[in-house]
Amino acid sequence: MNSLSYLNHDQQGFPPPEQALSDPNGLLAVGGDLRPERLLNAYYNGIFPWFNLDDPILWWSPDPRAVFVPGNMKISRSLVKYLKKQDWTYTINHNFEAVTAGCAEPRAGQDGTWISSEIQQAYLSLHQQGYAHSLEVWQDKQLIGGLYGLAIGQVFCGESMFHRATNASKAAMIVLQQHLQRCGFKLIDAQVVNPHLDSLGAKSIKRDDFLRLLTHLRDGEVSIDSWSKAEVSIEL
């Protein structure tokens, strides 16, 4: 029977993901901190943080895992028709802080999100070090949607997305997976299966299979200019 591990400030390592609890699904460890070194170690080993504002830091590796293969995203005809009517522009790494702030905005019917100022600062540090990246959706120079995550070799680990206009986050996801495919990425880690991701074509795979893929891809090479500041296009 698996038991929960408790991390101290000096302990950078994690227990094997296979030791995660089944209830709640994927909970692996408690504690530690959000220093860049620990976060990178977590993602490199298929682990990610998620916790409510008043909780200690919780670390997860759920089974099954939600993933996309870049280029295989499901785009409905109605969504294509809608997006073709929009005069939106898309950029890479133009305003990481604004994207994380947007992701931290409460959703309808919620009082807040788990993305605290501490979380935003932690991922900003990773962005400044070249590991975390954002994709922005603009309308008339106003930020209307976006997403952010980490690049680990040929794997992009998606963290969060937001929208202030209908379908803007879906557009961001479409542009992201097209961009990743062009740059040589092989997998998008979407963490936990949910109806929204399922509607976009996310696949649910066993944790063991995900970890094998991650081990194979996490040191792979991608295009050197994958994350240069740039405007990118959407292909519909």
Curated annotation (Swiss-Prot):
The record, for InterPro entries, names: Acyl_CoA_acyltransferase, Leu/Phe-tRNA_Trfase, Leu/Phe-tRNA_Trfase_C, Leu/Phe-tRNA_Trfase_N
Give the principal location in a single coarse category: cytoplasm
Q: Which reaction does it catalyse?
A: N-terminal L-lysyl-[protein] + L-leucyl-tRNA(Leu) = N-terminal L-leucyl-L-lysyl-[protein] + tRNA(Leu) + H(+); N-terminal L-arginyl-[protein] + L-leucyl-tRNA(Leu) = N-terminal L-leucyl-L-arginyl-[protein] + tRNA(Leu) + H(+); L-phenylalanyl-tRNA(Phe) + an N-terminal L-alpha-aminoacyl-[protein] = an N-terminal L-phenylalanyl-L-alpha-aminoacyl-[protein] + tRNA(Phe)
Location within or outside the cell: Cytoplasm
**What does the record list as GO biological process?**
protein catabolic process
Q: Spell out the GO cellular component terms annotated for this protein, sorted alphabetically and separated by semicolons.
A: cytoplasm
UniProt KW Transport keyword: no
| GO MF annotation list | leucyl-tRNA--protein transferase activity
Record has tRNA processing as a keyword: no
State the family it belongs to.
Answer: Belongs to the L/F-transferase family.
**Protein's job:** Functions in the N-end rule pathway of protein degradation where it conjugates Leu, Phe and, less efficiently, Met from aminoacyl-tRNAs to the N-termini of proteins containing an N-terminal arginine or lysine.
**HAMAP family from the UniProt entry:** Leu_Phe_trans
Name of the featured protein: Leucyl/phenylalanyl-tRNA--protein transferase
> Which lineage do the record's taxonomy fields give for this organism?
Bacteria, Pseudomonadati, Pseudomonadota, Gammaproteobacteria, Alteromonadales
The gene that this protein is the product of is aat
